[in-house]
């Protein structure tokens, strides 16, 4: 299977949060699954850290190193993702999450998310 991590999942992974369900951890760590992180999630984390709205127990460099040394693939924003973004109904106000939905649709990925607004879209998701 092919999965896209929502930003909160990345944060919960790096922070080893007890909020992360064990079955979701298993999906992410299962070697036959391909797990992707969208570059927009990294931008969202950087912005929130810069504004003081997010504090992690690791630095941003350590977060990047964790991602690079794990088995995650980074998806850059592509033209097709932006086209899908423009086609989305305005269910969710958060532009970062809307771009994650568009990316998942364009790349045929299942989003791992607890976000009920993302779950309202016509996109595969799991939690």
Q: Predicted regions span which residues?
A:
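Generic structural signal for small/hydrophobic residues in well-ordered secondary structure
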Residues: 6-8, 45, 85, 104
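Alpha-helix capping/helix-boundary segments
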Residues: 9, 41-42, 81, 100, ...
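Active-site neighborhoods of divalent-metal-dependent phosphate/nucleic-acid chemistry enzymes
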Residues: 57, 69-114
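Short, well-structured N-terminal submotif of metal-dependent ribonuclease cores
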Residues: 1-37, 53-65, 107, 116, ...
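Basic, glycine-rich
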Residues: 119, 124-127
